[in-house]
């Protein structure tokens, strides 16, 4: 068995057992051990111990040096080692954060590029067809369809006629609401109709009485009679010839009442 690897292993264990109190002494021991290993490996290679073992020792020597340098930096008890570890940790964190930020930026850029590509590929939606009729903002109770213009004109005419009727009917301006206005107008028209009927009946009665009075007196005696209807009033006689020329009884009554009565003083 070759004593070089065993000696290297024993020297390797010494820094871990030494702990943090050794400080710089542990580092020097490791450097001496590494140099001894290299010397033994060179001697064995020069002594002809075997080509394969020498090559393996040469390969293991730089690895041991790297590990020893790492152990010196981490296991050293002084403040210099801790400062190095802290600075390395900060550098590592800074590099990691910068890497994360760069990755986020690249992801955002790729997303924006994909979105722009998708927007370019997808065409905009077609515009809705325009309506043939003119859209008018509807008031309360008004339609906005294609027949809205004619409907609005008809309602405006109705409202104008209602205003005219309100002006004709007395006291209708005080009423509020179309239904109540129509009721007032209907009642007024019915009252006028009843008055007209009453006046027509009275006129028929007067005409019948006048006709009966004319038939009671013959035409030859009609002109010679003088009627005293009231004290102090005289009645001018009318000749039958003037009555027979085409005057109706109603006209004759109007003439007698209107201009043939004179007050005697």
From Swiss-Prot:
Region Disordered, annotated ranges: 1-132
Any GO molecular function: DNA-binding transcription factor activity
GO biological process: regulation of DNA-templated transcription
Basic motif: annotated span: 142-155
Keyword set includes Ligase: no
Cystine pairings recorded for this chain: none
Sequence segments annotated as region (Helix-loop-helix motif): 156-192
Keyword rRNA-binding: no
Protein name in the entry: Transcription factor BHLH089
Protein source organism: Oryza sativa subsp. japonica
């Amino acid at each position: 068995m070759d004593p070089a690897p065993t000696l290297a292993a024993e020297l390797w264990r010494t820094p871990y057992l030494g702990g943090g109190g050794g400080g710089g002494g542990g580092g020097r021991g490791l450097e001496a051990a590494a140099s001894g290993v290299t010397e033994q490996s060179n001697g064995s290679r020069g002594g002809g111990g075997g080509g394969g073992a020498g090559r393996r020792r040469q390969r293991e020597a730089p690895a041991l040096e790297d590990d020893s340098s790492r152990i010196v930096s981490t296991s050293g008890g002084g403040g210099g080692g801790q400062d190095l570890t802290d600075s390395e940790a900060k550098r590592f964190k800074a590099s990691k954060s910068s890497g994360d930020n760069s990755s986020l930026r690249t992801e955002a850029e790729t997303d924006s590029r994909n979105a722009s590509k998708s927007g370019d590929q997808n065409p905009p939606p077609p515009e809705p067809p325009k309506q043939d009729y003119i859209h008018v903002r509807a008031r309360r109770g008004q339609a906005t369809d294609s027949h809205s213009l004619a409907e609005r004109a008809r309602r405006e005419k109705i409202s104008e006629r209602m205003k005219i009727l309100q002006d004709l009917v007395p006291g209708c301006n005080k009423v509020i609401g179309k239904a109540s206005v129509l009721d007032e107008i209907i009642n007024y028209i019915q009252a006028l109709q009843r008055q007209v009927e009453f006046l027509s009946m009275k006129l028929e009665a007067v005409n019948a009485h006048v006709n009966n009075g004319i038939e009671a007196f013959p035409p030859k005696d009609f002109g010679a009679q003088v009627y005293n209807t009231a004290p102090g009033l005289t009645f001018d006689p009318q000749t039958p010839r003037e009555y027979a020329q085409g005057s109706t009884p109603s006209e004759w009554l109007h003439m007698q009442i209107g201009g043939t009565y004179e007050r005697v003083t």
